[in-house]
């Protein structure tokens, strides 16, 4: 085998999975693009805890364990991503304390898109809910 790159790609030499999660510092082009967008335009994703965003949303030194619990603050530091979906509300309605916990992790102008609970959106009772 002469080209070792594919074999090398099998081994993750990244940081320990438990390393703290930190935001990836945005480059100048990303900051400039965000500054040119209208403030009324909001971009975001359906979640903040996608592991493949290391080096894009999370710093290259970030671990991946705990993204669901600790990744929201880092996600909200990206100048383009000023909103995110709260999918878990579909499965079980979140409490006021949950919403307050999320809100405390982001800037004041950050927004959430909350998925309605399945009891509201489903026209039938699911087998797993009987």
Protein language model regions, located:
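Residues lining hydrophobic/aromatic ligand-binding pockets adjacent to catalytic sites
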Residues: 1-130
């Amino acid at each position: 085998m002469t080209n070792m790159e594919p074999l090398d790609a099998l081994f993750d030499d990244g940081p320990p999975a438990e390393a703290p999660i930190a935001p990836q510092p945005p480059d100048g082009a990303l900051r400039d693009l965000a500054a040119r967008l209208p403030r009324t335009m909001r971009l975001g994703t359906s979640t903040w805890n996608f592991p493949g965003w290391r080096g894009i949303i999370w710093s290259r030194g970030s671990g991946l364990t705990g993204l669901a619990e600790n990744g929201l603050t880092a996600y909200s530091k990206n100048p383009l991503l000023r909103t995110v979906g709260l999918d878990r509300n579909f499965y079980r309605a979140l409490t006021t304390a949950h919403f307050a916990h999320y809100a405390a992790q982001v800037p004041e102008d950050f927004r959430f898109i909350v998925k309605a609970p399945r009891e509201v959106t489903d026209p039938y009772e699911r087998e797993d809910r009987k």
